Amino acid sequence: MREIVLDTETTGMDSAQDRVIELGMVVFEFDPASGTVVRVVDVFDELEDPGFAIPPATIAIHHITDDMVSGRQIDDAAVAHILKDVAVVIAHNAAFDRPLVEQRWPVFADMDWACSFKDIPWREEGFGPAKLEFLLHANGFFHEAHRAEADCRALLELLSRHLPERQQPALLPLLETLNQPQYRIYATGSPFETKDMLKARGYRWSAEIRCWSRMVAGEEARAEELTWLKRRVYAGRPAHVEVEP
């Protein structure tokens, strides 16, 4: 089977306002029974002009300048082609990357997604922060690239490593979450003052429907999220939560 590891570099951290300026993808084959990565099949990396100046603070992180992206556009047909025969898109913090790429390339909305940040029990396996650079360092890698293709390759290497407690590749628990039902939770009518709390929880703002939402996997996660919303966001107010399978 084939999956794809995806990473983006963007103009900023607001998925409602910012734009993708670099899209990186690594397609790989794996054994679904063991979670073993077999081989890399294809690699994609292209830059795109966002149509406005990249903020200096963002350039300082990924070192992609206005001159590097000037006049460039990512090939939509090439993106669609590389997704052919791919079962799942994996991103480290998919809650950020997914809305950005779905907005730019609607083909991603029809794909199944997995998040290596939240769908792998890193803390239970003895790791601290689940940020990619920390996980890589804990596994003996020193990676400071902050470029899309390099981050994809680094994540794939991390997914191929065995978790210390399970003694299985990190890819395997990620695959297990895909067998659970996926739900999009909408925090309809959430109070304005809770926006930072929602964003920190992994919710993303949709300017089109003017609502915060996030994806969760499984009935347990769904129930937990609804309880959290009612207690922390609505806090005794009438709750306006919508769930979409």
Residue positions per predicted region:
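Acidic two-metal-ion nuclease catalytic site recognized across multiple nuclease folds
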Residues: R161-P245
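Short Asp/Glu-rich motifs
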Residues: A78, L155, A217
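Generic structural signal for hydrophobic core residues of well-folded globular domains
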Residues: I120-R123, H162
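Conserved non-catalytic scaffold segment of RNase H-like nuclease domains
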Residues: M1-M111, K118, E125-A145, L172, ...
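Residue-level "edge-of-site" marker
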Residues: R72, E149, C211
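Active-site catalytic microenvironments for nucleophilic, acid-base chemistry
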Residues: R104, A138, L158-E165
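Short secondary-structure capping/turn micro-motifs that flank functional sites
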Residues: D75, C152-R153, R214
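Acidic, divalent-metal-coordinating active-site segment for phosphoryl/phosphodiester hydrolysis
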Residues: A150-L158
